[in-house]
């Protein structure tokens, strides 16, 4: 049975939530494999908006949903998000939601450190959500994390907290921040331990069992591949690997378990926070895209930067992630434009290149090379059939396919999950 990885191919906010929700109808299991509660999904179901930032999208559909070991989990946010969804009428029990026992936790010390750095102590503003994601991953790599399973081992938890705070209190002293007493952190964790522990499981075994049963597994990525810690616009990236390969490490399933990688891309480009953005439009076009596309962050409410579709960037991530097909979203936002531009290459220091360099200084110097296409006046919003799209919209989509080297598998024409043109089935064996 085919399993599918969904990965963003831009800087996040590509519309993965809707696509994952749409695909989850065919899936038996939905897995989050990286990130934390710093990236949000908005699902619109029967006119009701559900905002998720930590829980997998499958929980809203009653599918078995797994938070894998590659995710850093804020236990207090977990409880809060759970309550909000339950208040909206979503039934969530340990039968449909499981959390990896070896997932690392986000604590208040991580949020403190994240905020202190972002507020200027480090001298580098990345544009993080200040939710402690980066510091939590630092502790994971530094082998001092408090993990889910530690909440169940109360006789050794205090010793682990003390070891963690030997590192954090030294940092806090250097930054002029008051030190944290181990008992304070212990009490914070005990406040929510009884609420989160029933969801804990050895999830790699659970996923292996479901795979052997022939169930379809959908791996849900957060953010976008261009924010990847290795392959993104470093240092203006997130703290985890967001490319498709992380699905294996962050879930405990091997590469042989995945049969299709579906990339998600907007019909234009957006970015939140700092960092290079070659096709950004700081003009009327950017304002048009932002207002028409309602480009404000789900988690932070921050206004997103907007620009033309960057085929160079998407093609690069298609190759790195082994993407076989693209779900193109928000085509309807482009309705009414007289002309639409696509970036087909870059120019830097007088020479042409067909990739985004790794050097941040070079990334800032690249100039986009545009191809201009005729726009369309007809509405694509809510279109359900390929044949009903305006001729120029079809030409635009076909040109994107040519430039990025893979076909468009799904085409989204509104936030509603039903408004999706189905071209290729990612779950087909």
Swiss-Prot record:
Q: Name one GO cellular component term.
A: cytoplasm
Q: Which residues form a coiled coil?
A: none
* Record keyword Signal present: no
Q: Where does IMP bind?
A: 13-16, 38-41, 129, 143, 223, 238, 302
EC number(s) in its UniProt entry?
A: 6.3.4.4
Reactions catalysed, as given in the entry: IMP + L-aspartate + GTP = N(6)-(1,2-dicarboxyethyl)-AMP + GDP + phosphate + 2 H(+)
Q: Which Pfam families match?
A: Adenylsucc_synt
Recite the UniProt keywords alphabetically: Cytoplasm, GTP-binding, Ligase, Magnesium, Metal-binding, Nucleotide-binding, Purine biosynthesis
Q: SUPFAM superfamilies attached here?
A: P-loop containing nucleoside triphosphate hydrolases (SSF52540)
Q: What does this protein do?
A: Plays an important role in the de novo pathway of purine nucleotide biosynthesis. Catalyzes the first committed step in the biosynthesis of AMP from IMP.
Q: What family classification does the UniProt entry report for this protein?
A: Belongs to the adenylosuccinate synthetase family.
What is the name of the protein in this document? Adenylosuccinate synthetase
**What is the species listed in this Swiss-Prot or TrEMBL entry?**
Bartonella bacilliformis (strain ATCC 35685 / KC583 / Herrer 020/F12,63)
Q: Which gene encodes it?
A: purA
